[in-house]
Amino acid sequence: MAKTKTGIFSGSFNPIHIGHLALANYLCEFEGLDEVWFMVTPHNPFKNQADLWPDELRLQLVQLAIEGYPRFRVSDFEFHLPRPSYTIHTLNRLKQEYPEREFQLIIGSDNWMVFDRWFESERIVSENKILVYPRPGFSVDKSQLPPNVHVADSPIFEISSTFIREALATGKDIRYFLHPAVYKRIIQQTDSIDSSHSCHT
């Protein structure tokens, strides 16, 4: 029986936006993946991540964003691994726990350019399939790729979570950059924080 081809889309999703969703949608419909798992990365105590939203909020926003599309799944798998967690450890644990699945690591071309700096990068490439999606300003020479690495011909989405956070912080109405349920939840969260702050001032 063929294994379920499962893309691991790991990120902070701080917050998740339509660029993330459209990319994952493309990879399922045009690149042969059966499912995409949004692997929300936890706060790393060894890094300065002052602008990182709480783990549970980011997880909840992804869940809201993917509801109704059966080929997407949100995962808190890395929340339960020792920190700092490394990609090689995550992939090995996933393969142990889900032997019926063929996991493929989804990364941007910007990350591929510095992939040799990743922990155990050679093992990751030799033992796993990697699906690289294009990022603006980071073109990949396909003729130089290892056999396990494939570059997707997906559209380039020039939206960043940093842009989303900065726009929200300045009161911009950017509802069409986010899934409606995500936008609604963020506005509720912001109103709650503002109300709490005003009660204490």
UniProtKB/Swiss-Prot annotation:
GO molecular function: ATP binding; nicotinate-nucleotide adenylyltransferase activity
GO terms, biological process: NAD biosynthetic process
NAD among keywords: yes
Catalytic activity from the UniProt record: nicotinate beta-D-ribonucleotide + ATP + H(+) = deamido-NAD(+) + diphosphate
Domain of life: Bacteria
Recorded metabolic or biological pathway in which this protein acts: Cofactor biosynthesis; NAD(+) biosynthesis; deamido-NAD(+) from nicotinate D-ribonucleotide: step 1/1
EC number: 2.7.7.18
UniProt enzyme class: transferase
Coiled-coil segments: none
Keywords of the record: ATP-binding, NAD, Nucleotide-binding, Nucleotidyltransferase, Pyridine nucleotide biosynthesis, Transferase
Keyword ATP-binding belongs to the record: yes
Function description: Catalyzes the reversible adenylation of nicotinate mononucleotide (NaMN) to nicotinic acid adenine dinucleotide (NaAD).
Family from the record: Belongs to the NadD family.
Stored NCBIfam families: nicotinate (nicotinamide) nucleotide adenylyltransferase
Name this polypeptide is given: Probable nicotinate-nucleotide adenylyltransferase
Species annotation: Bacteroides fragilis (strain ATCC 25285 / DSM 2151 / CCUG 4856 / JCM 11019 / LMG 10263 / NCTC 9343 / Onslow / VPI 2553 / EN-2)
Organism lineage string: Bacteria, Pseudomonadati, Bacteroidota, Bacteroidia, Bacteroidales
Gene: nadD
